[in-house]
Amino acid sequence: MPANPWIFAALAAVTALAPACDLGSLPAVPVAAGAPVRLLVLPEAGRSAVLDLLAGAQASLWMDMYLLTDEDAIAALEGRARAGCDVRVTLEPAPYQDEGANQAAFDRLAAAGARARWATPRYTYTHAKAFTVDHARLVVMTLNLTGAGLAGNREYVLVDDDPADVAAAEAALAADQTGGQAGAAARVVTSPDASRPALTGLIEGAGSSLALETEELTDPTVVAALIAARGRGVGVTVVWPGPAAGAPSVFLSLAAAGIDVRALDGPPVHAKAVSADGRTAYVGSANLTPTSLDHDRELGLALADPSVAAALAATIAGDAARGASPSP
């Protein structure tokens, strides 16, 4: 896939301004280094950026997906299954409390020969949005495979070819197919076991800057950690979907603490991403809510990767500049 020149331009601008940071300033929860990871920013990257990853599978395509309704995405999975690819898809039975939302995709995938499974009731929701390709590539997304996710919302995608990350993700995906459980991993972080410490570790470990873009933010521990970070001199930016008028009290409280809080009207924010000090980052499916962190199946990547973290920070800064401050 061709590189996105906008990302590299943004990265260059932010990297030039990023302060030096030694290993001692990394988060309290270790964020492991590893193979380079590519960041895709949607909607700018276009829906084909994700669809091409699906269509490129030859031997295997394993997936957890909260909501699968996009015709092109379903067709890509059907096509891979009919071509003999080992397609395994675990779907949430009731996304947005709608028990029929994923039924058409489930039926079509099963008819095409894929191993379609409903997610275990072990979790409140299986909210993950991730897949592996040919046991060699991990794709972690903030988006559901819907029309809005692929072509309308502010979303992020990490494309990761690190073998350890792929293996860890596949252990989780395989467990979700059978209702089992997988062990801990270094960079692949899942709810309900690891998302909370990974995300609070990123926030608590920040030394100079924090940039967050999130659809939902209600968790009291996360809110307290953000306010504490601002109290120790960290510049904190939070972008959420808004609207700015009549903002929830949590965003008014963050703004009162000196945090730069911005409501973005468009593109609609469905992202779940954190950049700390322009050097460490989280991208994944976890919203900053108690349910998402403690009760759902979520999957994300927490990593020490300045290229990803700086590009995230640049995108969030651009969104913040176009956003509005919250008001009661």
Kindly label every feature range from the protein language model.
Residues C21-Q58, D64-A206, E216, P220-T280, ...:
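HKD-type phospholipase D/PLD-like phosphodiesterase module
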Residues I7-F8, S292:
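Hydrophobic alpha-helical segments involved in membrane association or supramolecular assembly
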Residues M1-I7:
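Bacterial N-terminal signal peptides that target proteins for export
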Residues A9-A18:
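Bacterial N-terminal signal peptides
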Residues A314-P328:
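Short, low-complexity, Pro/Ser/Thr/Gly-rich segments in the mature regions of secreted, periplasmic
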